[in-house]
């Protein structure tokens, strides 16, 4: 055993896998751990019908982790670098999705679940790479900070972080999610996806790439085992922050994975999952979906705007403290007059402030009846909620947008002892259907307490579409990104319904509290990653 470990490390650190080599793939073990944490800590399966059933299948889960490795396959195979690069981006992913939809209609059997899970892992890998490799507006990439603080280049960072991942997460017996990776890839489907644009890709080349990734995965584990005491001391920034750096760390990658897996799974079922992305690199590597606007207003500061605050407040703190929220999703991608099975708005309840909650809070959802502008009001990118005087037409209480237009489409009661740190949802199907029939009359959703509820104390705070950092220093983790407001629209019929009579419980998924049934229409996806301009991967 010792001899085998030494041989693996010799291969890992020899010329074939030197830091400058394309075979020093983008942190394969790190990618897998991001996918593990997405399933166990970030993904909210109650939001997407059918997704819990998919990942309750252990073989599908293993296929998902293998898919998280897949896109880097060609960096270790001569002449396959372009094919590997393309596997990271939307053109490849969209063709892949269409082939899966054609080959595997519902209901999905075991083979279909494994193929779909593998695909979702591949999508996750590409998303994880963006903040790892590339700076965003005011967001330094993970690789940039690794170079700054630990003096490690691209390839060195990825090998050593993989070894640190092994030390922290995979060293204990039974904790490695893959153990020994295999090459049971869906080669036939992959060849069909590659066929039109990459005829040079063969099953033999894919197998060669798979074997190289498996060797790298095992090799970084061996490196971590042999140097488990020295590596954390030698690379202190990476050892301290590989998980909690908000832009590119493991938690951030898991959060991004949960968003993309939800988005593409909804597309596979003929629906749409809308959630605001970070404006990563734009234009170029990534065209983010930014079509979500939200703000809350309150009577105590009737000219204030909160459009860029990370916290979204929907209830007052007792008599006279009137406040309400508005939210709008860009539904322009929805085909005209498409049948809608269900549509649900999901908000993440982050906390309470002010006086103790003295009675149940009832928050109702209504269609908005007039136009409004999100605005740029911001006081604190971590804990802000107060806003600043409105400029440039940003919505404020004085605008009077919150007039109640009749009966609500849905209302949610939040009890005194209801826990925070969970998703809350409203059935907004009538509002989405109205938008499809009369888009010129669609202005979004109004969320406010009912008159009977408004007298009680306690302000309920949800995460807004601007929520990102949990600490000012950037080391509070990246979970907030995947907990921004979401609209899930699913079609009628089997695609938009749950498997069987009830959604199965997945014991190792963080399914959270049970949600009321819901979903909504089939729709074109939001703008996605396109092209590969300026790519520097591998």
Question: What are the functions of these language-model segments?
Answer:
Residues 14-22:
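C-terminal segment of classical bacterial N-terminal signal peptides
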Residues 21-122, 130-193, 209-251, 262-292, ...:
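N-terminal, motif-rich segments that launch catalysis or mediate targeting to/interaction with membranes
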Residues 291, 429-512:
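Proprotein-processing/basic-patch segments
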Residues 326-330, 341-348, 366, 423-431, ...:
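Residues within well-ordered beta-strands of beta-sheet-rich folds
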Residues 348-359, 453-455:
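Extended, low-complexity, turn-rich repeat/linker tracts enriched in Gly/Pro/Ser/Thr and Asp/Glu
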Residues 353-434:
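Beta-strand-rich interaction/scaffold domains
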Residues 297-354:
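A short beta-strand-loop element at or near the start of a globular domain
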Residues 1-8:
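Bacterial N-terminal signal peptides that target proteins for export
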